[in-house]
Amino acid sequence: MFEDEPHAEGAAAVAAAREALQALCQELNLDEGSAAEALDDFTAIRGNYSLEGEVIHWLACSLYVACRKSIIPTVGKGVMEGNCVSLTRILRSAKLSLIQFFSKMKKWMDMSNLPQEFRERIERLERNFEVSTVIFKKFEPIFLDIFQNPYEELPKLPRSRKQRRIPCSVKDLFNFCWTLFVYTKGNFRMIGDDLVNSYHLLLCCLDLIFANAIMCPNRRDLLNPSFKGLPSDFHAVNFKAAEEPPCIIAVLCDLHDGLLVEAKGIKEHYFKPYISKLFDKKILKGECLLDLSSFTDNSKAVNKEYEEYVLTVGDFDERIFLGADAEEEIGTPRKFAADTQFGKLTSQASVDCNLQQHFEKKRSFAPSTPLTGRRYLQEKEAVTTPVASATQSVSRLQSIVAGLKSAPSEQLLTIFESCMRNPMGNIVKIVKGIGETFCQHYTQSTDKQPGSHIDFAVNRLKLAEILYYKILETIMVQETRRLHGMDMSVLLEQDIFHRSLLACCLEIVLFAYSSPRTFPWIIDVLGLQPFYFYKVIEVVIRSEEGLSRDMVKHLNSIEEQILESLAWTNNSALWEALRASANKVPSCEEVIFPNNFEIGNGGSVQGHLPMMPMSPIIHPRVKEVRTDSGSLRKDMQPLSPISVHERYSSPAAGSAKRRLFGDDPPKETLMEKIMAEGTQLKIAPSSVTAESLSISPGQALLTMATTTVTGTTGRKVTVPLHGIANDAGEITLVPISMNTTQDSTAESLVSLTAQSLIGASPKQTHLTKTQDAPLTGISKPKRTGSLALFYRKVYHLASVRLRDLCLKLDVSNELRRKIWTCFEFTLVHCPDLMKDRHLDQLLLCAFYIMAKVTKEERTFQEIMKSYRNQPQANSHVYRSVLLKSIPGEVVAYNGDYEMTDGDIEDATKTPNCSSEPVKEERGDLIKFYNAIYVGRVKSFALKYDLSNQDHIMDAPPLSPFPHIKQQPGSPRRISQQHSIYVSPHKNASGLTPRSALLYKFNGSPSKKAKKRVIAISGDAESPAKRLCQENDDVLLKRLQDVVSERANH
């Protein structure tokens, strides 16, 4: 990708770029300073990158950046940013569509290493474009519903200036209504990129134009006679409009997915006062906006005001939707059916497809389905527009809290009063403090986004408070039943629990309204640590069944964001929790439930499959049963085996929790002592057998699986063992039987470290205390508590993503387990590698290095291609990785394990054209891998190099790989409209022994009975059905196809 071109060719290219830039600047009337800066940046970038596509498009990106940095003094001794050149003009001159601009601009920002403030500006601009595109798609059909089709009327005849004015056409009305909307929306910047509020503002504009059309006696021809909002006597010959302008807000909300209360609030408190202000400023005039004498002046005045707004405040001229070349310039939807010729359909379909792909890639209005947490998803709703989806989310939220108040219910008050110390006062104080902080930041303008009106803030806060008390009551009822009436004071007195729960409710409300204040805005303004906030997410999802499918996906994606990066920042509370636990990072085996690992060395066939799509919805009764530990079936893994109490327990899972709840003995168990101190294990002589054992009261019996020991002769010995542990912490392993290829005499006792037998390999020995085995078949992990829960979720998230990558790249189970072992090694022994970095960065590096070591190589380009298809993938993850300070000496790494630029198609170099000094050194993933990662992991990874005999003996056992979490609930409801449930197939036991013959009286003729007897008694298999050949690869491929097909729907 980074090719050195001849000097002459490079000079010619720069000259051509300079000529193209000069022509562009002349057309835009730009100053020389901005042009020179744009050319310098372009030349620096081109020296480091191969820029694909037209040069003029990249010049437009460079020119836009230069213009945004330009400051122009104004008459009022202020300053104005932007050279008075709108983005629309730049793109129109460069013949670059908006969708292409956003795509290229993202790459340009990465290559130029532009500051975060500029990136956020582009993100706001892109979201504003997306909101406007979605609103315009709704505007056209609503306009057609109310008014005549503007493309069915005859074109205007040319006329001289002396001719008198003619009435406005439907097309003029269409353009005026949209321009008035975008100009009004620009005035209310707090509404601009809020989809729900913007849509209701559009309904207000349509309502205003309709009222003027009704009130003007000669303009009723503009209206659609079949519109349902017309007055009942509209078609009467002597129809006379009422004195008060009619309001059709209710009709529009009913017909076009609006929220009546929200829309009327926008009209009364924002739109009507603003229109009055426009009349006072003489921008609008006349008794009727559509009067013959005033419409033209009104249209010109609104367009002039909006042009000034675009040049001074805005970037994106939203009138571009109305242009004749809108489809080419931006990718807007088709105008109207009557205007669309047959020849345009193909190109229009392509434009709509590009627009749809852009929205799907951005995921602004419909969050993608994360790889984890799918068991909580409900069934898919019918396909709706983004506006309908947003308004339905708000309606659903309002239906959840309907009839409730922002205060504790009688039942919740009873729970508070039953506590040893009534927490009511403290809870009210916390809620009030969070409410004040939220309103202050929600209404405050910042560089990132404008402030909203206090009415919006109060409305959002009230919804969140009602939801908070509702969910808190549900949690308390579940916990009381789960813990059999235990006192709730400890949980209810934890401020972090209430702050996290209310913050989560606020996030739900903001997401329902499609607010631009996206996560982690809410925890930033409330000062919440992500490491604490994530604990409440699953609790909320399980406690509130009314959440929509998109809402659950959004909350799941937030949890993934925290687990993958936000909890690993330099100032995260995670590092304090690790210090409190003596910096002992738990391994996967210590935190995952023992029965949640794959079985066998290579893993089961099931273990090679990706996360299976779960049935959409869990039956409420099944979910209710699962939350009650007392009602769990013996063979059922609980949905969340950790209670809310345990989630908010002290990071040290011993003292506090045990004193408060008494569910663990206060004394350190023998097994904990053994694991902590690395007890020496001894194999007793073969003369000692399990049958001759006698166990004293101070000893414990340990049940063992088989272990494989390599003797001095190199022979492998399979030894089934029993173990006895005494008070001194020593374990004596007693062989039950020994199978070898030849007879061998018992030698002196073989010393093995505990790590070798309680390590990570599924072949290894597992030590469990017999008396500690739970009767329900659900055994607890070795480490519990707050920190263990966090790492359990981290390991699960990483395993799901790795499984998905391995499936797409056709990686063997053996290599997958080695990658997993390497990844776990970095988390446990090199936790600092995760500081201010991303989980996927370490996962991708582990994948690459182990593929190199084992000679099952995958190029980084192949790995990245598969990674980009994951729902959470973001180019920032692999293009901007934190780099530590590197010593002056260059470490001579083995070239075989170094990543080269040829391995990745879009590797990035950091050019020296950064607009601001870089606060921290960052680079692409290749640079991080070669400069930092290899040096820390190479010695460990080389132990799995099978081509080197010295390494085979040193290779640690492979870590166990978590298996797919199966849906524990059964039966599962698959539809909310129909009572249809899915249950696992049960092997029905026959009513009679298999040796007997089944004869059905009055149903089995004698001839068929004879044939049945012959078929059963014969040795040959019945040819009634075609035999299925046992081919695991074919079966696996079919299952993979089914899974992929389900995942794409």
Swiss-Prot record:
Location relative to the cell: Nucleus
Main subcellular localisation: nucleus
Pocket as annotated region, ranges: 385-944
Region described as Spacer: spans on this chain: 585-779
PTM remark: Cell-cycle arrest properties are inactivated by phosphorylation on Thr-332, Ser-640, Ser-959 and Ser-970 by CDK4.
CDD domains in the record: CYCLIN_RBL1 (cd20605)
Record-listed Phosphoserine modification sites: 640, 650, 748, 761, 959, 970, 983, 1004, 1022
GO cellular component: chromatin; nucleoplasm; nucleus; transcription regulator complex
GO molecular function: promoter-specific chromatin binding; RNA polymerase II transcription regulatory region sequence-specific DNA binding
Keywords per UniProt: Cell cycle, Chromatin regulator, Nucleus, Phosphoprotein, Repressor, Transcription, Transcription regulation, Tumor suppressor
SUPFAM superfamilies in the cross-refs: Cyclin-like
Residues recorded as bearing Phosphothreonine in the entry: 332, 369, 385, 992
Stretches the record annotates as Domain A: 385-584
UniProt-listed GO biological process terms: cell differentiation; chromatin organization; negative regulation of cellular senescence; negative regulation of G1/S transition of mitotic cell cycle; negative regulation of gene expression; negative regulation of transcription by RNA polymerase II
Superkingdom as given in the UniProt entry: Eukaryota
Residue ranges, annotated region (Domain B): 780-944
InterPro entries to which the protein is assigned, alphabetical: Cyclin-like_dom, Cyclin-like_sf, RB_A, RB_B, RB_C, RB_fam, RB_N
Family as reported in the entry's similarity comment: Belongs to the retinoblastoma protein (RB) family.
Job of this protein: Key regulator of entry into cell division. Directly involved in heterochromatin formation by maintaining overall chromatin structure and, in particular, that of constitutive heterochromatin by stabilizing histone methylation. Recruits and targets histone methyltransferases KMT5B and KMT5C, leading to epigenetic transcriptional repression. Controls histone H4 'Lys-20' trimethylation. Probably acts as a transcription repressor by recruiting chromatin-modifying enzymes to promoters. Potent inhibitor of E2F-mediated trans-activation. May act as a tumor suppressor.
Assembly behavior: Component of the DREAM complex (also named LINC complex) at least composed of E2F4, E2F5, LIN9, LIN37, LIN52, LIN54, MYBL1, MYBL2, RBL1, RBL2, RBBP4, TFDP1 and TFDP2. The complex exists in quiescent cells where it represses cell cycle-dependent genes. It dissociates in S phase when LIN9, LIN37, LIN52 and LIN54 form a subcomplex that binds to MYBL2. Interacts with AATF. Interacts with KDM5A. Interacts with KMT5B and KMT5C. Interacts with USP4. Interacts with RBBP9.
Protein's name in the database: Retinoblastoma-like protein 1
Annotated source species: Rattus norvegicus (Rat)
Name of the gene this protein is made from: Rbl1
